[in-house]
Amino acid sequence: MTARAYLCEGMDPDEAKGALARANPGAVVQTVKAGSVKNEFLAEMVAAQTLQAMESGGLLAKKPEIDLLLRLAGTTQISRAIRLEGSVNGGRFLVIVAGHMALTSPPGFTGAQLPRRLLSRSELARVEGAALLGAERS
C-alpha cells in the first residue's frame, strides 16, 4: 500500500484529481483543504484504513474517496466532512492518492509532495479516531 499527498496551487482541484486518477488507475484519489494534512505519513495511515475497508466491505460511504474524506474529517456525516476538510476552487489544496501499486505523477503535474515524518501524538490520535469511525459502524 502506498499513498502520496501533494500540495497544489494554481490549478483546479477536480482537474488535479482527474489527472492523478488517470495516471493511477484503480487508486483512490481525493482533494482536501490545504491545511488538512501536513505529514504524508498521516495521509498514508488514514488512506490505508480506507483501502482495508474497501477490501472488507466496511466503507463509511459508497465511494472510497468519500470514505477517505470522512476519516480525515473525523466524522461520518458527509456534509460536515465537506465543510471541515473539503477543497475549494481558487486556493491551495491537497490531493491524496493511494493504492496497492506504485504511484506516479502525470506529466506536467506541479503539486509539491508533502514531507514525510513520524507521526506526532496529535496525528496518531487522528489516525486512531479515523479507525474508530469504522468500529462504530460495525
Whereabouts are the PLM-identified features?
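Generic detector of well-ordered alpha-helical segments enriched in charged/polar residues
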Residues: 17, 21, 79-82, 103-106
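Glycine-rich, aromatic-bearing surface loops/beta-hairpins
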Residues: 84-138
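Ordered, amphipathic secondary-structure segments that act as subunit-interaction surfaces
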Residues: 37-97
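Residue-level signal for functionally critical sites in structured catalytic/ligand-binding pockets
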Residues: 33, 63-75, 105-109, 126-127, ...
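N-terminal interaction modules that seed assembly of large macromolecular complexes
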Residues: 2-59
